[in-house]
């Protein structure tokens, strides 16, 4: 999915609560480090739900926040999107219960990766 979105011209970024060392280790272990156009970590800027991570990534990539989508499995992710003026997509297969995610008013909630993939291809 990530490779396809990248090939279609979408910018891919990571905004994480992990440290830079932790993120690079995780992305290297999965062979995904070069897949992302930009990344931002909690030890580099304000933590979620503060909008700074998303604002910095959007600015770095030269994008408009109104065309930015934050995909997240926590309320912190979705609140960061709300605080930054971006759209949020919730994924049910993560850390927080779907009821808590829905309270953040995401534009879409995906039950699984194939459903997320389909929605992104059709709507993003």
Go through each PLM region and give its residues.
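Catalytic-core regions built around general acid/base machinery
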Residues: 1-9
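Short phosphate-binding/catalytic loops that engage adenosine nucleotides
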Residues: 10, 86, 106
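Substrate-recognition "cap/lid" segment bordering the active-site pocket of phosphatases
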Residues: 13, 19-70, 75-84, 98-102
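Short beta->alpha connector loops at strand-helix junctions that form conserved
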Residues: 43, 92-93
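The conserved SAM/SAH-binding core of class I Rossmann-like methyltransferase domains
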Residues: 71, 89-91
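Flexible glycine-rich beta->alpha loop in the catalytic core of nucleotide-sugar glycosyltransferases
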Residues: 87, 94-96
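Short acidic-hydrophobic, aromatic-tinged amphipathic segments that line or gate anion-handling sites
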Residues: 108-112
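Short amphipathic alpha-helix with an adjacent loop that forms part of the alpha/beta core around
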Residues: 118-124
């Amino acid at each position: 999915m990530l490779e396809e979105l990248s090939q279609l011209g979408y910018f891919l970024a990571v905004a994480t609560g992990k440290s830079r060392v932790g993120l690079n280790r995780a992305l290297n272990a999965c062979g995904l480090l070069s897949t992302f156009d930009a990344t931002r970590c909690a030890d580099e800027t304000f933590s979620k739900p503060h909008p700074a991570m998303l604002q910095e990534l959007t600015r770095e990539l030269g994008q408009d926040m109104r065309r930015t989508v934050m995909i997240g499995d926590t309320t912190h992710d979705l609140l960061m999107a709300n605080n930054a003026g971006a759209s949020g997509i919730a994924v049910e297969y993560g850390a927080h219960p779907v009821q808590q995610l829905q309270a953040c008013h995401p534009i879409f909630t995906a039950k699984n990766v194939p459903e997320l993939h389909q929605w992104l291809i059709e709507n993003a």
